[in-house]
């Protein structure tokens, strides 16, 4: 028997798993959230209805990340979002960089590859939070800069 509390698991070919990850409606399964998790989420929503501090801090961190990426010549898509897509433009290198960031630098980021994005637009999608420190962001950007050179990726010329 399998005992589960929350989450799910899929098996299949790489193509099938990639399709499900890319096009399923958010990995929604029938498992309900535990009451403590639901209560915590409700408390967070109530707090954020009255507080602008977290949003302002996140905007500051996003601006800082973009500035540091620019200073290192690491290409990223400009958008009004809190999501900072760092452009790799190569599916194999995108996965390799994601793996190296996790294994060697303890930084988790999901590679975004085809079919989620068109071929040739592969990217790493970063979302700085209000709780990330400037040191965290510096560590990320310095790690990326090292890998950028190691993987022979092109830089943006200022």
Cite the ranges covered by each PLM segment.
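Short, small-residue-biased leader/transition segments that mark boundaries at the very start
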Residues: 1-3
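Thr-Gly-centered strand-to-loop micro-motif
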Residues: 5-7, 31, 86, 111-113, ...
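Short, glycine-/Ser/Thr-/acidic-enriched flexible segments
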Residues: 13-17, 91, 131-133
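Hydrophobic side chains in well-ordered alpha-helices
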Residues: 19-20, 97, 136, 140
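Structural signal for hydrophobic packing residues in well-ordered secondary-structure cores
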Residues: 20, 24, 28, 45-52, ...
């Amino acid at each position: 028997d399998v005992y589960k509390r929350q989450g799910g698991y899929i098996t299949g070919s790489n193509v099938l798993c990639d399709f499900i990850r890319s096009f399923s409606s958010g990995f929604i399964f029938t498992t309900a959230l535990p009451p403590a998790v639901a209560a915590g989420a409700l408390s967070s929503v109530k707090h954020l209805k009255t507080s602008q501090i977290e949003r302002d801090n996140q905007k500051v961190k996003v601006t800082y990340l973009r500035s540091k990426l620019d200073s290192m010549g690491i290409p990223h898509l400009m958008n009004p979002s809190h999501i900072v897509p760092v452009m790799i433009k190569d599916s194999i290198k995108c996965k390799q960089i994601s793996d190296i960031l996790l294994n060697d630098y303890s930084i988790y980021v999901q590679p975004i590859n085809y079919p989620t994005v068109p071929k040739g637009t592969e990217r790493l999608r970063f979302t700085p939070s209000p709780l990330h420190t400037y040191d965290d962001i510096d560590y990320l950007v310095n790690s990326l800069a090292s890998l950028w050179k190691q993987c022979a990726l092109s830089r943006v010329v200022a």
